[in-house]
């Protein structure tokens, strides 16, 4: 493909294969973006004038409640490389369309540790900063160096550091002020040469112990393998049962509210944060409200993990959203706690 070849405009494009819930919806127009230079010609095409835009990578963090009446940009940018190194770290760049899990595995194959706790998280590299993905004691922002993005209004190419991205818990600038304004075309990570394992989570520690790592520091590959095993045991494969992983964020509340809650619910699962606030396990709250395994139509709560909502076949995004709202209502009424969805609902 030449540098100047435009991405094809695809009308009435089916999005079922482009969202991990498997919702059978369509886009008015879609363009598959394989080169950064294709972005602005697609956005500025007269057929897209005045239409809303949606950027999709793996579609693992979106609930499509109906057909999208605008232009969907399907990010298919690929490539990964070590851009530089110093005495302390490697700096590794990956294109926005690289599958996240494959990228994590590749870094380990190249002898670079640091992302192994984030194995098997669905989606693409370009989506990772938007959500500030995290799991098993590590957040992406801890390994983040910078990203490259195209601003869709002006066509400007920008380089943003962590401060500009304003990372928070499953949050960033791109979920708020920057939403739908940018396409992240590549991300650079800083992977430390002096690496320390993070294996404190109980499920992870048990899996490592079962694999012969009890009392001995695990390798990065051992952590990667253990994370994959734990996630596969707890979470359904989107190719077999449509889902977007954890549907709700773990809520964080103040110490006074937590003490009052603990009086009513002594066994509440909680984690004290550095600032004194307390993070609650959303899955535990949902399970206590009796939702694990329950369904509303073809939308259901997974029987093994209450934090995961699933499409059992033929569910619409609206049905999943209705289920989510019913869960939020019950958790609010019983615990006085608000659950916030992780995926973007459109």
From Swiss-Prot:
Transmembrane segments: none annotated. It comes from the Bacteria. The active site is at residues 170, 246, 342. The keyword NADP applies. Pathway: Cell wall biogenesis; peptidoglycan biosynthesis. Pfam families: FAD_binding_4, MurB_C. The keyword ATP-binding does not apply. Keywords: Cell cycle, Cell division, Cell shape, Cell wall biogenesis/degradation, Cytoplasm, FAD, Flavoprotein, NADP, Oxidoreductase, Peptidoglycan synthesis. Cell wall formation. This is UDP-N-acetylenolpyruvoylglucosamine reductase. It comes from Paraburkholderia xenovorans (strain LB400). The lineage of its organism: Bacteria, Pseudomonadati, Pseudomonadota, Betaproteobacteria, Burkholderiales.
């Amino acid at each position: 493909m030449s540098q100047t070849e435009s991405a094809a405009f695809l009308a009435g494009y089916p999005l079922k294969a482009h969202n991990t819930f498997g919702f059978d919806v369509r886009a008015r127009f879609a363009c598959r973006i394989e080169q950064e230079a294709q972005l602005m010609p697609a956005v500025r095409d007269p057929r897209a004038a005045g239409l809303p835009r949606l950027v999709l990578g793996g579609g693992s963090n979106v609930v499509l409640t109906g057909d999208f009446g605008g232009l969907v940009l399907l990010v298919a940018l690929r490539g990964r490389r070590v851009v530089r190194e110093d005495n302390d770290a490697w700096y590794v760049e990956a294109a926005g369309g690289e599958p996240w899990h494959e990228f994590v595995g590749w870094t380990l194959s190249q002898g670079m540790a640091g992302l192994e706790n984030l194995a098997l998280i669905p989606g693409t590299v370009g989506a990772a900063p938007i959500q500030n993905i995290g799991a098993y004691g590590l957040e992406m922002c801890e390994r983040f160096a910078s990203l490259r993005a195209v601003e869709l209004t002006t066509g400007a190419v920008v380089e943003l550091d962590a401060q500009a991205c304003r990372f928070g818990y499953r949050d960033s600038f791109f979920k708020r002020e920057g939403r739908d304004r940018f396409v992240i075309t590549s991300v650079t990570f800083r992977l430390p040469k002096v690496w320390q394992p993070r294996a404190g989570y109980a499920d992870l520690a048990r899996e490592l112990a079962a694999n012969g790592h009890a009392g001995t520091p695990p390798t990065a590959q051992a952590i990667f393998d253990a994370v994959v095993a734990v996630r596969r045991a707890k979470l359904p494969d989107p190719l077999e049962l449509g889902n977007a992983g954890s549907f709700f964020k773990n809520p964080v509340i103040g110490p006074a509210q937590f003490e009052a809650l603990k009086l009513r619910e002594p066994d509440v699962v909680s984690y004290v944060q550095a600032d004194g606030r307390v993070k609650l396990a959303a899955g535990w709250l949902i399970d206590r409200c009796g939702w694990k395994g329950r369904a509303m139509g073809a939308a259901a709560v997974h029987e093994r993990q209450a934090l995961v909502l699933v499409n059992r076949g033929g569910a619409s995004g609206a049905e999943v959203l209705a289920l989510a709202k019913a869960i939020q209502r019950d958790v609010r009424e019983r615990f006085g706690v608000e659950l916030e969805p992780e995926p973007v609902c459109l």
